[in-house]
Amino acid sequence: VLYPIFKMLIFLVIGVSIFDILQTILVPKRCSYLNTYDSGKLSGFYNEEKNEIDILIEGTSHSAGGILPMELYEKYGIKSYNLATGIQSIEVSYYMACEALRTQKPKVLILDVGNLYISDATEFYWRMVLDEMHFGRNKFKFANEYCKQHLDMDKLEWEIMFPLFYYHENWKILSQRNFRNNTNTKRNYDKGGIITSTIAPAGLSVEYMNEVAENLLKDNERFLFMYEGEEYTETYNENKLYSVDIPDKNIEYFKKLQELCDANGVKLLAVKVPSLNLPQSYRSAWTREKYNKVNKICEEMGIEYYDIMYEACLEIDWGEDTWDGGPHLNLNGARKISADLGNYLTVNYDLPNEPNEMWDKDLELYQEVRNVALLELEKDFITYINLLINECNDKMIFIAASDDMSNGLNEIDINILRLLGLRVDFSQALNNSYIAVIDNGEVRYEALSNRSLNYEGFYGLSNKKYEIYSSGWYTNSQASIKLDGIEYVVNSRGLNIVVYDVQRDLVVDSVCFDTHTEYHTSVRNNSIVNGLRQKFEQYIVEVEDQL
């Protein structure tokens, strides 16, 4: 009697295992180090120790890259986790909170209220969370809400619950990447925080954004002057260009989130991470009108609200602290936000501050990635060379001049270059070619000439070949730094610098400082720099975090 039952159980276990393997292969591969704000959040969160997280963070991409949990831990000892995802609607925040509270008992849940204005999140952004949520009651309710809001879809609820059925056609586009793990099987060292190491200045001020919003709010009438042959007509009708009204459905879910927090003894803190853009072209631009609206709603609901954009005593430099022209903050801005928010939390909430060995190890990995990002973000010549001296003395540094690299150098600049180990007479360098190679803090090669220069050698643990070329203004103004045949140089006027991590076999930065002028303007290719930082973080995640 037991044998048939035992046999059936074996077949069931085998069937479930095959189902799970196929599902893992077919689900799109997402990696937290690719700057996709909506990947790896729940999967990494599930791997945290039970009841270890004191602060949960939810919201859209503004808070995903604007609040860094490891900054909170480093400075204040606060253990937090960032569950914010791209275009995260308030419904998604609610169901993620339901799921998070199954394994954690946080003291505070932070919600970035920008998502109160999201009413049309597409299928893609819901799926990012659904795919990673564990099977259970919360996922069932979440999938049910998902189906209600996407009535135009022909997917059944069970197809939403099980990604294998949803992504079954992906077998047509399988690649090697599909056979790697879909999500993290260990803790996320960054606790869901996203580091961005590029700069794209905003083209407007907060004052101008609010001025535009005020004008848009006043313009509620549409007119049309039309000629059809000899006939002329004028029509006027009500038509709002801009509104700060919040959909009723979003208010309803905001209340449900409040009730969920109350039922679980969690303090709900509404915040807003700064976001700057023209309100008519970017719906998430955080105008003062939106701040006033949300502030009033929070007062009526009895929810604590801290608007970091309009209430905090900090100054965002919109020329340096954003990576996409204003909407999102880079590491510079995120560190300011995290420091301010950490101070607010410690002053207003009774939070534990206890050392944790595992978190300390995660912090070390975070600091490694942050150091690379800070190097890539640095625009000041003196500060950058100091970073090379103090933080990169275990790296290889390749330097090639293009056009002219000495006209703008002053005594302070030359002294700092001397500390780096460079010895040429820079007073003789005007319009000339120049090459330097520094390895582990020692200058291996340095040359200055009024003719073009070529130099090659071998680098790294695998003894790969590097090739360097420099030509000054008299000889065609070019620079090249190739590592293993791959070009990394910016090739702009001045000192072109490439920094290579020997132990990890990775280039970590490529920059040019225009030392022909006194301003030493830095030049970087943002897409290349993003790629370098991502490869470094990938190494941290896939190699060092697995040791």
Predicted segments with their positions:
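Membrane-embedded segments
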Residues: 58, 62-148
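Active-site segments of SGNH/GDSL-like serine hydrolases
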Residues: 258-283
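C-terminal regions of proteins
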Residues: 284-363
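Secreted/periplasmic serine-hydrolase-like ester/acetyl group-modifying domain
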Residues: 129-264, 353-373
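Active-site-proximal beta-strand/loop segments in catalytic clefts of secreted hydrolases
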Residues: 58-61, 83-86, 112-114, 271-274, ...
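Alpha-helical transmembrane signal-anchor/signal-peptide segments
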Residues: 25-45
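Hydrophobic membrane-insertion alpha-helices, especially the h-region
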Residues: 3-24
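Short acidic-hydrophobic catalytic motif
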Residues: 374-396, 400-547
